């Protein structure tokens, strides 16, 4: 148990998080964390549908640019890579919409369970 606690403390260390962010490599393509989502999950699709047009266009541009870079086996210049702080700030653009969709889904399930008790 002590070993697990030390491991969790190490993983939650901001220095380790920055190091791991650099290892993941999606920043080399100019992508943010929320640019990766499950295209088969209805909750994610609904959250993407609710994005404002400017955020949706920015997301689409980043994904297309990253696909083109991957096809040509290139990376963006280092000065265009999003930093860890930028990813934590701007890169979580889908999370509020996804949280809203999940709350609505939970509320619907509660109502169905409440109404089916009769």
Curated annotation (Swiss-Prot):
This protein's record includes keyword Protein biosynthesis: no
Annotated keywords: Allergen, Electron transport, Membrane, Mitochondrion, Mitochondrion inner membrane, Respiratory chain, Transport
Family annotation (PANTHER family): CYTOCHROME B-C1 COMPLEX SUBUNIT 7, UBIQUINOL-CYTOCHROME C REDUCTASE COMPLEX 14 KD PROTEIN
Family from the record: Belongs to the UQCRB/QCR7 family.
Domain of life assignment: Eukaryota
Any one of the GO CC terms: respiratory chain complex III
Protein's cellular compartments: Mitochondrion inner membrane
Membrane topology annotation: Peripheral membrane protein
Region (IgE-binding. Immunodominant epitope): 1-32
Swiss-Prot/TrEMBL GO biological process terms: mitochondrial electron transport, ubiquinol to cytochrome c
Family annotation (Pfam families): UCR_14kD
Organism lineage: Eukaryota, Metazoa, Ecdysozoa, Arthropoda, Chelicerata
Function: Component of the ubiquinol-cytochrome c oxidoreductase, a multisubunit transmembrane complex that is part of the mitochondrial electron transport chain which drives oxidative phosphorylation.
Assembly and oligomerization: Component of the ubiquinol-cytochrome c oxidoreductase (cytochrome b-c1 complex, complex III, CIII), a multisubunit enzyme composed of 3 respiratory subunits cytochrome b, cytochrome c1 and Rieske protein, 2 core protein subunits, and additional low-molecular weight protein subunits. The complex exists as an obligatory dimer and forms supercomplexes (SCs) in the inner mitochondrial membrane with cytochrome c oxidase (complex IV, CIV).
Name of the featured protein: Cytochrome b-c1 complex subunit 7
């Amino acid at each position: 148990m002590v070993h697990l606690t030390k491991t969790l403390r190490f993983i939650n260390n901001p220095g380790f998080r920055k190091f791991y962010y650099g290892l993941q490599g999606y920043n080399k393509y100019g992508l943010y964390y929320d640019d990766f989502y499950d295209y088969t999950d209805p909750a994610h699709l609904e959250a993407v549908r609710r994005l404002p047009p400017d955020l949706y266009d920015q997301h689409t541009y980043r994904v297309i640019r990253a696909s083109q870079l991957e096809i040509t086996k290139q990376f963006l210049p280092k000065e265009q890579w999003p930093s860890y702080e930028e990813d934590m700030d701007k890169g979580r653009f889908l999370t509020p919409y996804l949280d809203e969709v999940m709350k609505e889904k939970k509320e619907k399930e509660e109502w169905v369970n409440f109404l089916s008790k009769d």
